[in-house]
Protein backbone atom coordinates (compact mmCIF):
# COMPACT_ATOMS: atom_id res chain seq x y z
CA UNK A 1 0.00 0.00 0.00
CA UNK A 2 1.40 3.40 -1.02
CA UNK A 3 2.17 6.03 1.58
CA UNK A 4 0.05 9.19 1.38
CA UNK A 5 1.43 12.66 0.64
CA UNK A 6 -0.66 15.80 1.22
CA UNK A 7 0.44 19.24 0.07
CA UNK A 8 -1.45 22.52 0.09
CA UNK A 9 -0.57 25.87 -1.48
CA UNK A 10 -2.46 29.13 -1.04
CA UNK A 11 -3.74 30.83 -4.22
CA UNK A 12 -2.37 34.21 -3.19
CA UNK A 13 0.17 35.98 -5.36
CA UNK A 14 2.18 34.56 -8.24
CA UNK A 15 4.24 31.46 -7.60
CA UNK A 16 8.00 31.88 -7.70
CA UNK A 17 10.93 29.83 -8.86
CA UNK A 18 11.40 29.10 -5.15
CA UNK A 19 7.94 27.52 -4.97
CA UNK A 20 8.75 25.49 -8.07
CA UNK A 21 12.12 24.21 -6.85
CA UNK A 22 11.03 23.78 -3.24
CA UNK A 23 7.76 21.98 -3.93
CA UNK A 24 6.15 21.91 -7.36
CA UNK A 25 9.08 20.33 -9.20
CA UNK A 26 8.98 17.35 -6.85
CA UNK A 27 5.23 16.80 -7.24
CA UNK A 28 5.58 15.08 -10.59
CA UNK A 29 8.19 12.76 -9.09
CA UNK A 30 6.12 11.91 -6.01
CA UNK A 31 3.02 10.75 -7.91
CA UNK A 32 4.62 7.51 -9.13
CA UNK A 33 5.72 6.46 -5.65
CA UNK A 34 3.00 7.85 -3.38
CA UNK A 35 -0.76 8.40 -3.17
CA UNK A 36 -0.76 12.18 -3.61
CA UNK A 37 -3.37 14.78 -2.66
CA UNK A 38 -2.60 18.30 -3.89
CA UNK A 39 -4.92 20.93 -2.48
CA UNK A 40 -5.38 24.58 -3.40
CA UNK A 41 -6.11 25.97 0.06
CA UNK A 42 -8.39 28.91 -0.71
CA UNK A 43 -9.97 28.82 2.77
CA UNK A 44 -6.56 29.55 4.25
CA UNK A 45 -6.21 32.51 1.90
CA UNK A 46 -9.19 34.36 3.41
CA UNK A 47 -7.58 34.58 6.85
CA UNK A 48 -6.41 37.94 5.47
CA UNK A 49 -8.53 40.27 3.27
CA UNK A 50 -8.90 39.13 -0.35
CA UNK A 51 -10.56 40.49 -3.47
CA UNK A 52 -13.13 37.80 -4.35
CA UNK A 53 -12.67 37.99 -8.13
CA UNK A 54 -8.89 37.98 -7.85
CA UNK A 55 -8.97 35.04 -5.43
CA UNK A 56 -11.00 32.95 -7.86
CA UNK A 57 -8.71 33.95 -10.72
CA UNK A 58 -5.63 32.97 -8.72
CA UNK A 59 -7.22 29.68 -7.66
CA UNK A 60 -7.79 28.68 -11.28
CA UNK A 61 -4.33 29.91 -12.25
CA UNK A 62 -2.70 27.79 -9.55
CA UNK A 63 -4.60 24.69 -10.67
CA UNK A 64 -3.36 25.23 -14.24
CA UNK A 65 0.20 25.64 -12.94
CA UNK A 66 0.02 22.38 -10.98
CA UNK A 67 -0.81 20.57 -14.22
CA UNK A 68 1.74 22.55 -16.23
CA UNK A 69 4.62 21.49 -13.97
CA UNK A 70 3.84 17.82 -14.52
CA UNK A 71 1.08 16.74 -12.17
CA UNK A 72 -0.83 13.85 -13.77
CA UNK A 73 -4.51 13.80 -12.69
CA UNK A 74 -4.61 10.06 -13.43
CA UNK A 75 -1.95 9.47 -10.78
CA UNK A 76 -2.57 12.27 -8.26
CA UNK A 77 -5.62 14.07 -6.86
CA UNK A 78 -5.84 17.83 -7.49
CA UNK A 79 -8.67 19.74 -5.84
CA UNK A 80 -9.80 23.02 -4.29
CA UNK A 81 -10.12 23.05 -0.50
CA UNK A 82 -13.46 24.90 -0.34
CA UNK A 83 -15.03 22.33 -2.70
CA UNK A 84 -14.58 19.60 -0.06
CA UNK A 85 -16.75 20.61 2.91
CA UNK A 86 -15.08 18.11 5.25
CA UNK A 87 -12.07 20.42 5.64
CA UNK A 88 -14.01 23.18 7.40
CA UNK A 89 -16.06 20.66 9.42
CA UNK A 90 -13.01 18.74 10.63
CA UNK A 91 -11.21 22.00 11.41
CA UNK A 92 -13.95 22.98 13.87
CA UNK A 93 -13.66 19.67 15.71
CA UNK A 94 -9.88 20.06 15.95
CA UNK A 95 -10.25 23.70 16.97
CA UNK A 96 -12.23 22.47 19.97
CA UNK A 97 -9.27 20.26 20.90
CA UNK A 98 -6.50 22.87 20.68
CA UNK A 99 -5.55 25.40 23.35
CA UNK A 100 -5.38 29.16 22.74
CA UNK A 101 -1.85 29.24 24.13
CA UNK A 102 -0.73 26.75 21.49
CA UNK A 103 -2.17 28.93 18.73
CA UNK A 104 -0.68 32.15 20.11
CA UNK A 105 2.79 30.57 20.14
CA UNK A 106 2.72 29.94 16.39
CA UNK A 107 5.50 31.98 14.79
CA UNK A 108 3.46 32.66 11.66
CA UNK A 109 0.62 34.17 13.71
CA UNK A 110 3.06 36.41 15.55
CA UNK A 111 4.66 37.57 12.30
CA UNK A 112 1.42 38.27 10.44
CA UNK A 113 -0.37 39.93 13.37
CA UNK A 114 2.56 42.01 14.62
CA UNK A 115 1.68 45.69 14.74
CA UNK A 116 -1.76 45.26 13.18
CA UNK A 117 -4.84 46.74 14.85
CA UNK A 118 -7.42 44.38 13.37
CA UNK A 119 -6.45 40.71 13.14
CA UNK A 120 -9.02 38.09 12.13
CA UNK A 121 -9.75 35.12 14.38
CA UNK A 122 -9.08 33.00 11.29
CA UNK A 123 -5.43 33.99 11.38
CA UNK A 124 -5.19 32.64 14.92
CA UNK A 125 -7.12 29.43 14.16
CA UNK A 126 -5.29 28.74 10.90
CA UNK A 127 -3.34 25.76 12.37
CA UNK A 128 -6.40 23.55 13.15
CA UNK A 129 -7.58 23.99 9.55
CA UNK A 130 -4.11 23.04 8.31
CA UNK A 131 -4.18 20.04 10.64
CA UNK A 132 -7.58 19.02 9.26
CA UNK A 133 -6.26 19.28 5.70
CA UNK A 134 -3.51 16.82 6.54
CA UNK A 135 -5.28 14.42 8.90
CA UNK A 136 -8.40 13.87 6.78
CA UNK A 137 -6.35 11.89 4.25
CA UNK A 138 -4.45 9.74 6.77
CA UNK A 139 -1.33 11.47 5.52
CA UNK A 140 2.10 9.93 6.07
CA UNK A 141 4.30 12.66 4.60
CA UNK A 142 3.90 16.44 4.27
CA UNK A 143 6.39 18.23 1.96
CA UNK A 144 7.00 21.60 3.63
CA UNK A 145 9.63 24.26 3.99
CA UNK A 146 11.49 24.85 7.23
CA UNK A 147 9.07 27.69 8.09
CA UNK A 148 6.12 25.27 8.28
CA UNK A 149 7.67 22.64 10.56
CA UNK A 150 6.08 24.20 13.66
CA UNK A 151 2.60 23.73 12.17
CA UNK A 152 3.28 20.06 11.42
CA UNK A 153 4.46 19.56 15.00
CA UNK A 154 1.16 21.03 16.23
CA UNK A 155 -0.73 18.79 13.79
CA UNK A 156 1.00 15.76 15.30
CA UNK A 157 0.16 16.98 18.82
CA UNK A 158 -3.50 17.38 17.86
CA UNK A 159 -3.61 13.95 16.22
CA UNK A 160 -2.07 12.30 19.27
CA UNK A 161 -4.40 14.18 21.64
CA UNK A 162 -7.50 13.23 19.63
CA UNK A 163 -6.40 9.61 19.31
CA UNK A 164 -5.97 9.30 23.09
CA UNK A 165 -8.98 11.35 24.16
CA UNK A 166 -11.65 10.39 21.65
CA UNK A 167 -10.85 7.71 19.07
CA UNK A 168 -7.65 6.27 17.64
CA UNK A 169 -8.24 7.23 14.00
CA UNK A 170 -5.42 9.49 12.80
CA UNK A 171 -2.16 8.54 11.10
CA UNK A 172 0.78 10.51 12.50
CA UNK A 173 2.18 12.66 9.67
CA UNK A 174 5.90 13.21 9.18
CA UNK A 175 7.66 16.27 7.79
CA UNK A 176 9.26 15.68 4.40
CA UNK A 177 11.84 18.27 3.34
CA UNK A 178 13.69 17.68 0.04
CA UNK A 179 17.45 17.56 0.65
CA UNK A 180 18.27 20.24 -1.89
CA UNK A 181 16.35 23.17 -3.24
CA UNK A 182 13.90 23.34 -0.36
CA UNK A 183 14.88 26.93 0.32
CA UNK A 184 15.62 29.25 -2.59
CA UNK A 185 16.67 32.68 -1.42
CA UNK A 186 15.89 36.23 -2.55
CA UNK A 187 17.96 37.42 -5.52
CA UNK A 188 18.65 40.83 -3.95
CA UNK A 189 18.89 39.75 -0.32
CA UNK A 190 20.09 36.12 -0.24
CA UNK A 191 19.75 35.97 3.55
CA UNK A 192 15.95 35.93 3.08
CA UNK A 193 13.75 33.28 1.48
CA UNK A 194 12.44 34.05 -2.02
CA UNK A 195 8.82 35.06 -1.45
CA UNK A 196 5.82 35.58 -3.70
CA UNK A 197 4.65 38.37 -1.37
CA UNK A 198 7.88 40.40 -1.49
CA UNK A 199 7.24 44.07 -2.29
CA UNK A 200 10.47 44.26 -4.32
CA UNK A 201 9.73 42.33 -7.53
CA UNK A 202 13.47 42.04 -8.28
CA UNK A 203 13.84 39.65 -5.35
CA UNK A 204 11.87 36.84 -7.00
CA UNK A 205 11.56 35.10 -10.35
CA UNK A 206 7.89 34.34 -10.98
CA UNK A 207 6.87 31.27 -12.97
CA UNK A 208 4.98 33.42 -15.47
CA UNK A 209 7.72 36.05 -15.93
CA UNK A 210 8.60 36.67 -19.60
CA UNK A 211 12.12 35.62 -20.75
CA UNK A 212 13.49 39.17 -20.84
CA UNK A 213 12.43 39.77 -17.25
CA UNK A 214 14.00 36.50 -16.09
CA UNK A 215 17.32 37.36 -17.74
CA UNK A 216 17.31 40.85 -16.24
CA UNK A 217 16.57 39.60 -12.72
CA UNK A 218 19.29 36.94 -12.77
CA UNK A 219 21.91 39.27 -14.22
CA UNK A 220 21.18 41.82 -11.48
CA UNK A 221 21.20 39.20 -8.69
CA UNK A 222 23.47 40.06 -5.75
CA UNK A 223 26.80 38.20 -5.64
CA UNK A 224 30.09 39.43 -4.11
CA UNK A 225 33.39 40.96 -5.17
CA UNK A 226 35.56 37.80 -5.31
CA UNK A 227 34.45 36.67 -8.76
CA UNK A 228 34.96 33.01 -7.78
CA UNK A 229 32.05 30.65 -8.42
CA UNK A 230 31.96 28.41 -5.37
CA UNK A 231 29.38 27.30 -2.83
CA UNK A 232 29.79 28.88 0.61
CA UNK A 233 26.45 29.69 2.18
CA UNK A 234 27.88 31.81 4.99
CA UNK A 235 30.45 33.90 3.11
CA UNK A 236 28.96 33.82 -0.42
CA UNK A 237 25.17 33.53 0.05
CA UNK A 238 24.31 35.13 -3.30
CA UNK A 239 26.45 32.85 -5.47
CA UNK A 240 25.49 29.84 -3.34
CA UNK A 241 21.82 30.57 -4.01
CA UNK A 242 22.41 30.76 -7.78
CA UNK A 243 24.41 27.51 -7.67
CA UNK A 244 21.52 25.80 -5.90
CA UNK A 245 19.09 26.96 -8.60
CA UNK A 246 21.45 25.77 -11.35
CA UNK A 247 21.93 22.40 -9.65
CA UNK A 248 18.23 21.69 -9.12
CA UNK A 249 17.24 22.64 -12.66
CA UNK A 250 19.99 20.65 -14.39
CA UNK A 251 20.39 17.78 -11.94
CA UNK A 252 24.15 18.41 -11.84
CA UNK A 253 26.01 18.38 -8.55
CA UNK A 254 27.22 21.70 -7.22
CA UNK A 255 30.79 20.36 -7.29
CA UNK A 256 30.52 19.68 -11.03
CA UNK A 257 29.11 23.14 -11.67
CA UNK A 258 31.91 24.76 -9.68
CA UNK A 259 34.47 22.82 -11.74
CA UNK A 260 32.79 23.83 -14.99
CA UNK A 261 33.16 27.53 -14.14
CA UNK A 262 36.72 27.54 -12.83
CA UNK A 263 38.40 30.58 -14.33
CA UNK A 264 35.11 32.09 -15.51
CA UNK A 265 33.36 35.10 -14.08
CA UNK A 266 29.94 35.81 -12.68
CA UNK A 267 28.80 37.29 -16.00
CA UNK A 268 29.21 33.99 -17.89
CA UNK A 269 27.67 32.02 -15.05
CA UNK A 270 24.63 34.29 -14.76
CA UNK A 271 24.08 34.31 -18.54
CA UNK A 272 24.10 30.51 -18.67
CA UNK A 273 21.86 30.22 -15.62
CA UNK A 274 19.38 32.70 -17.08
CA UNK A 275 19.05 30.64 -20.28
CA UNK A 276 18.52 27.46 -18.26
CA UNK A 277 15.76 29.08 -16.22
CA UNK A 278 14.14 30.61 -19.33
CA UNK A 279 14.09 27.22 -21.09
CA UNK A 280 12.62 25.50 -18.02
CA UNK A 281 9.88 28.08 -17.49
CA UNK A 282 8.95 28.52 -21.16
CA UNK A 283 7.83 24.87 -21.28
CA UNK A 284 5.75 25.35 -18.15
CA UNK A 285 4.18 28.56 -19.46
CA UNK A 286 3.16 26.95 -22.74
CA UNK A 287 1.32 24.14 -20.93
CA UNK A 288 -0.14 26.59 -18.40
CA UNK A 289 -1.85 28.78 -20.99
CA UNK A 290 -3.25 25.69 -22.74
CA UNK A 291 -4.92 24.57 -19.50
CA UNK A 292 -5.99 27.93 -18.08
CA UNK A 293 -9.32 28.49 -19.85
CA UNK A 294 -9.97 24.90 -20.86
CA UNK A 295 -12.96 22.73 -19.99
CA UNK A 296 -10.43 19.99 -19.24
CA UNK A 297 -9.21 21.93 -16.20
CA UNK A 298 -12.76 22.12 -14.80
CA UNK A 299 -13.27 18.39 -15.37
CA UNK A 300 -10.00 17.57 -13.59
CA UNK A 301 -10.93 19.74 -10.58
CA UNK A 302 -14.44 18.27 -10.40
CA UNK A 303 -13.07 14.72 -10.41
CA UNK A 304 -10.40 15.65 -7.86
CA UNK A 305 -12.95 17.15 -5.46
CA UNK A 306 -15.16 14.06 -5.74
CA UNK A 307 -12.30 11.69 -4.97
CA UNK A 308 -10.97 13.86 -2.13
CA UNK A 309 -14.46 14.09 -0.59
CA UNK A 310 -14.88 10.30 -0.62
CA UNK A 311 -11.66 9.87 1.36
CA UNK A 312 -12.12 12.88 3.66
CA UNK A 313 -15.73 12.09 4.55
CA UNK A 314 -14.75 8.67 5.89
CA UNK A 315 -12.31 10.26 8.33
CA UNK A 316 -14.76 13.04 9.20
CA UNK A 317 -17.45 10.51 10.11
CA UNK A 318 -15.03 8.76 12.47
CA UNK A 319 -14.16 12.14 14.03
CA UNK A 320 -17.83 12.98 14.55
CA UNK A 321 -18.49 9.59 16.11
CA UNK A 322 -15.43 10.01 18.32
CA UNK A 323 -16.68 13.27 19.85
CA UNK A 324 -20.39 12.36 19.84
CA UNK A 325 -21.70 14.65 17.11
CA UNK A 326 -24.96 13.86 15.37
CA UNK A 327 -27.42 11.19 16.46
CA UNK A 328 -27.47 7.47 16.67
CA UNK A 329 -30.31 6.29 14.49
CA UNK A 330 -32.97 3.94 15.79
CA UNK A 331 -34.13 1.12 13.57
Curated annotation (Swiss-Prot):
Is Coiled coil set as a keyword in this record?
A: no
**Gene Ontology biological-process annotations:** tryptophanyl-tRNA aminoacylation
Q: What is its main location?
A: cytoplasm
Q: What class of enzyme is it?
A: ligase
Pfam families in UniProt? tRNA-synt_1b
Positions of short motif 'KMSKS' region:
193-197
As its record notes, the protein acts as a catalyst of: tRNA(Trp) + L-tryptophan + ATP = L-tryptophyl-tRNA(Trp) + AMP + diphosphate + H(+)
The answer to whether UniProt assigns keyword Ligase to this entry is yes
Query: What does the subunit section of this Swiss-Prot or TrEMBL entry state?
Result: Homodimer.
**Alphabetized GO MF terms:** ATP binding; tryptophan-tRNA ligase activity
| Enzyme Commission identifier(s) | 6.1.1.2
* Protein name, per record: Tryptophan--tRNA ligase
Species of origin reads Listeria innocua serovar 6a (strain ATCC BAA-680 / CLIP 11262)
Q: Which family does it belong to?
A: Belongs to the class-I aminoacyl-tRNA synthetase family.
Question: What is this protein's function per UniProt?
Answer: Catalyzes the attachment of tryptophan to tRNA(Trp).
Record key words, sorted = Aminoacyl-tRNA synthetase, ATP-binding, Cytoplasm, Ligase, Nucleotide-binding, Protein biosynthesis
- Per UniProt, the short sequence motif 'HIGH' region occupies residue numbers 11-19
- Residues annotated to bind ATP: 10-12, 18-19, 145-147, 184, 193-197
Per UniProt, L-tryptophan binds at 133
Give its localization.
Cytoplasm
**Gene3D superfamilies assigned to the protein according to its UniProt record, in alphabetical order:** HUPs (3.40.50.620), Tyrosyl-Transfer RNA Synthetase (1.10.240.10)
Amino acid sequence: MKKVIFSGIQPSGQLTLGNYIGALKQFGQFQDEYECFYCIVDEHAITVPQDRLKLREQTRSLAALYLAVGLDPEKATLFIQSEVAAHAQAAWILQCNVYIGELERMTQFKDKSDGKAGVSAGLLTYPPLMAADILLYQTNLVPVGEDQKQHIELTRDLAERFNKKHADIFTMPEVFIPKQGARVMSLQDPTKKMSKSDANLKNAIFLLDPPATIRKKIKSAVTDSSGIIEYNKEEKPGVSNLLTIYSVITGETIANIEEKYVGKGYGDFKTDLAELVVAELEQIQERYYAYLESEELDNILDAGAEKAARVANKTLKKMENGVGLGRKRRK
